Amino acid sequence: MATVASKQSQNSMLSNIWGWITTVDHKRIGILYGVTAFVMFLVAGIEAGIMRWQLSMPGLDVVSPDVYNQMFTMHGTTMVFFAIMPLNAAFFNYIIPLAIGARDVAFPRLNAFSYWTFLAAVLFMNFGFVVGAVPDGGWFAYAPLSEQPYSTNQGMEFWSIGLMLAAVSSAVAGLNFIVTIVNLRAPGMSLMRMPVFIWMSFVVQILLAFAIPVIAVGLIELTMDRLFGTVFFKPSAGGDPILWQHLFWIFGHPEVYILILPPMGIISDVLPAFSKKPLFGYPFIVFSGIAIGLMGWAVWSHHMFTVGLGPIAVSVFTITTMLIAVPTGVKIFNWIGTLWGGSIEYKTPMLFAVGFIAMFIIGGLSGVSHAVAPSDYQQQDTYYIIAHIHYVLFGGAILGIFSGIYFWFPKVTGKLLNEKLGKYHFWITFVGMNLTFFPMHYLGMNGMPRRIYTYATEYGWDNLNALSSFGYVILFIAMVIFIVNVITSLKSGEDAGHDPWNAPGLEWTIASPPPVYNFSDLPVVEGRDPYWIIKRRAIAEGKELPGPQALVDPSTVHLPDPSYWPAFTSLGLLIFATGFMIEIPVWFVKYPIAIVGGLLVFVGILAWSNEPITREKNH
Amino acid sequence: MAQIAESTGHHGAEEEHNCTGIDHRKLLMWVFLSTDCLFFGALISTYMVYRGQSLVGPYPVDIINIPITTISTFVLLCSSFAMVMALSNTNRDNLKGIRIWLAGTAIMGMIFIGFQIVEFTEFAMEGLLLSTNLFGTTFFTLTGFHGAHVSIGIVWLWVMFYQSFKGKVGSKTALNVELCGLYWHFVDIVWIVIFTLLYLVGGFDAGPPIVG
C-alpha cells in the first residue's frame, strides 16, 4: 500500500512539474519569474558579500584578485539582468493582465518562451562557475579588456552569449506586453484610465523592445571578435573600442529606466491605496514617465564623460542629463502630493514605498552631481558611483519591488505576509542599506577606486569600509527575516480575502489567489481606480460592499491549452548557444552542436505554429 | 472560429474583445519590424563609422561590383511585387495563383541569396575575409545578417507553399500570408538602404588618407 501511495504521489509530482513546464498561464509564469529571479538576487547578494568580506579590512586575502574580478562582474550582471529585470518581469506577468482586466497576455505561449529562454540565459552564464571560466570583464565588459588577448578563457563568451539569450527573452516579452496593453484592456479602460503601474510597464516594454536590438548588435560584434576573428573593437586593425561603449550605453541608459520605472509604477499604485486618496496629478506622472522614456535615449554619453568626446558632446549630454531629472522630480512631488492630507496607513508595502521615495531622492541627487561633467571627472570609477547606483537600484528598485511583493503577495497566494516581521524587515533593510552604501559616498570622495580587490591602511579607508561591510551583515539578516516571513506566511498566514487593502485596482475585484481564467466576465471600467468607484457607489446606495467575482467552472471559459513547444524551443536555443562554446571541427563546420540547436529551434517554431491554441474538446 | 465560440459557451462571446481592432499578430509584426530597424540601424552605423578606416586592403573600390549587385537588387525588388500578388491571390482564394506567386517570391529570394554566395566567394578569393580588415568585418556582418533575414523569409515562404497543399492557405487565413509579406517587404527595404550605402555610396572607398 505504502509503495503504491508513494508511487502515486511521485506520479502526481511529475505531472505537477510537467504542468509547470508546459504552462502558458501568465500567473504561473509570473511566479516562475519571481522565484527564479529571487534566487538569483540571493546569489548576486552572496557575491556582493564575498566582496564586502574581502574589503572589510585592508590587506585581506579572502579571495584572489582574479576571483574578485569575477565576483564584481557576476554581481553586477546578475543583479541587473537576472534579478531586478526578471523581478520586474514577474510583476509584469502576474499583474498586467489582472490590472487591465484581461484573461491572459496576447501571446501566452510566447510568454512561456520568454521565461524558459530567460532561465536558459541564467543557466548558461552561471555554467561558467562549473567549468571554471567565469566572466571577469566587468558588467559593461569594456572592449578591449573583454577581447581575446586580455581575457583568455571562455568567461566573456559565457557572458556575451548568455546576455544574448537574455536579450531574446526580454525583447520577445517586450513585444508581447506592448500588444497586450494596447489590445487587451477591458472595455472602458482607456489609456488614461490605466493604473500608473501599467503605464510605466508600457513605457518599459517599449524601451525593452527598442533598446535590446542595439545591445544585441554590440554583443554580436563582441562575440564575433572573440570567436570569428573580426576586428570590430581591435585598435591594432583600426577598430575603435569606444564604439562598444556607445552601443552598450545606448542600450544601457534606457536599461536604467527599464529597471526603475516599474518600481516607480508599483509605488504609484501603493501610495494611493494606503493614503486612501487618488494619485495626485495622475496625468503629470504618466507624461513624466513617457518623457523619461523618450529622454532616456539622449543621455547615454554621460557614462563616457572621461572618454574624451570633446567639449560639445560633453556639454550636450550634461544638459540632457540634467533635463531628465525634471520629470523624475515631477514624479517625486506628485507622490508627496498623494500623501498630503491622506489618511495614511503605515502597512509594510507603504513603508517600503515611502522608503523608496526617500532613498531615491538621495540617489537622484548624487546622480545630478555627476551629470555635471567637471564634477564627474572626479567621481568617475570611484565608490561614489557605486554609492549612487546602489541608492537608485537598491534604495529605489529593490525597495519598490519589496513594496510590490508585500502589496500583491495576498493576491498571489491568498495569504497576508506577517505585518510584524514585515516591519522588522523594512526597518532592518533600511538601516542596513544606508550603513552599507552611504559610507561609499565618502570613500569615493576620498579617492577609493571601484574594482580594486584590496587597499593599504595608509589610505584611511579602513573605518568606512568596515562600516559598509557591517551594513552588509545587517542587510543579510533582513533578507533572512523576509524569507522566514514568506515561508511562515505561506504555511500559516492570515487569510487575505479578495481585497485586504481596500485598493482601487481591478485585480482586487476577483478572488485571491485568482482563478485560472482571472475574470469570468470581463469587467467594464467606468473611470480611474475602477474598484473604488464600484465600492463608493455601493456605500452611497447603502448596499453591501461587492464581494469578489463569483467563481465559475473553468471549462466554460476559453483558455489556451498548455504547450511544451515554448520550452522545447528555448532548449533548442540553449543548445544553439552552447554549440558556440564547443569547437568540434567536422569537415568545414566548426560548431556542429550549434547547427543541431538551430534545427531544434526550427522544429520547435514549426510545431508551435501548427499547434492550435485551443484543441477542440469532446470531439 | 465558429466552432471555438460554440465550445466555449456563454463566456465565448467577449473572447474577441480587442481595443484597437488590429489583430494581435499584425500588431506584433509591426512592432517587431520597427525594433528590427534598430538592429539594422546599429549594424549600418557600425559600417558607416568604420567607412574608410581599414588599414589594409582589399578596399571596397578594389572589389565591389556594382553592376552584378544591381541585378540581384532588381530581382529582390521584383520579389516584393510577387509577394503582393501572392497576397492578392490569397484574398481571392485563387489556389493556383497563390502557389505560383509564393514559389516565385521564394525563388527570387533564392536567386538573391545565390548572388550573395557568389559575391562572398569572390571576395574571399580576392583576399577579403571577416578578419582581413574593418571593411571585411563590417561588410560581411551587415550583409550576412541581411542575408540571414532573407533566408528566414525564404524558409517561411516555402513552408507556406507547402501548407497551400494542405488547404491551409486562403482568404480566411490571409493574415498568415500578409504577415510574411510585411516581413518580406521590410527585408527588401532594408536592402535598399544597404545597397545605397554600401555599394552606391561606399563602393568607391579606398583606405585611409596617407598623411605626410
Identify what each model region corresponds to.
Chain A
Residues 2-619:
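Membrane-embedded and interfacial regions of multi-pass energy-transducing membrane proteins
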